[in-house]
Swiss-Prot record:
Class of this enzyme: hydrolase
Active site: C20, H74, D90
InterPro entries: N_Gln_amidohydro_ab_roll_sf, NTAQ1, Prot_N_Gln_amidohydro_ab_roll
Protein name: Protein N-terminal glutamine amidohydrolase
Entry similarity comment: Belongs to the NTAQ1 family.
Gene3D superfamilies: Protein N-terminal glutamine amidohydrolase, alpha beta roll
Gene name for this UniProt entry: tun
Pfam families recorded: Nt_Gln_amidase
Domain of life (superkingdom): Eukaryota
């Protein structure tokens, strides 16, 4: 794997456990600041479903040999610099940082075929520049009814847009007609962002 990465070391990235949406926003911000020419090739990807019960494997918070966990949603960063090259940067995975798209999807999501329909994963893919402008969260989802924190928040102020105080739900929602970006099933997601070497060879003939 080439070493020309947007984020050479995971230690260089802003990270707070259980705030994946903000961690990815910070990655987008870092690209805009240090590699602005690459921003149009970057995406924030939300994973969820109607019941907000999505199984993911190879996660640091997972259990057992397969490191599986069920989240209400998850967010990762994706860099798609060319049709045959797509890298996933997930700050919560036990896979390498980054990981090639096909390996990441295969090991993290496996297949929907063995899962009940209520556990099928859907993906909202949002261009990084759009995410930087439209994402806004006052972190209310991380507070208990008494106002205490479920998990300690980042030390920096909440990320707030100019037009909205808290729109996280619009990003987690997997209804195609609501929220920014495009929504895909697992198979559609793979079809749109993975081109096998065999297909690329055929197209180049």
């Amino acid at each position: 794997m080439t070493t020309d990465f947007l984020f050479p070391k995971i230690a260089d990235c802003s990270y707070v456990s259980c705030y994946c949406e903000e961690n990815v926003w910070k990655l987008c911000e870092q690209v805009k600041r240090t590699r602005p020419e690459e921003l149009s090739k970057c995406y924030a990807v939300f994973v969820s479903n109607e019941g907000r019960t999505v199984p993911l494997w190879r996660q640091k918070a997972g259990r057992g040999d397969d490191q599986v966990v069920i989240w209400d949603y998850h967010v990762f960063f994706m860099h798609n610099p060319s049709p045959n090259r797509c890298l996933v940067f997930d700050l919560d995975t036990t896979l390498p940082f980054p990981t090639y798209f096909h390996k990441y999807v295969t090991e993290t999501f496996r297949s929907d075929l063995a899962l009940r329909p209520e556990h099928h994963r859907f993906f909202r893919v949002i261009p990084a520049d759009t995410y930087l402008i439209e994402f806004s969260s006052d972190r209310r989802h991380m507070r208990r009814p008494d106002g205490s924190w479920i998990k300690p928040p980042p030390s920096y102020p909440p990320i707030l847009s100019n037009t909205n105080l808290h729109c996280l739900g619009d990003f987690i929602c997997m209804s195609a007609g609501k929220g920014p970006g495009a929504v895909y099933s697992l198979s559609e997601f793979v079809h749109n962002f993975y081109k096998s070497p065999h297909v690329m060879a055929q197209n180049n003939k």
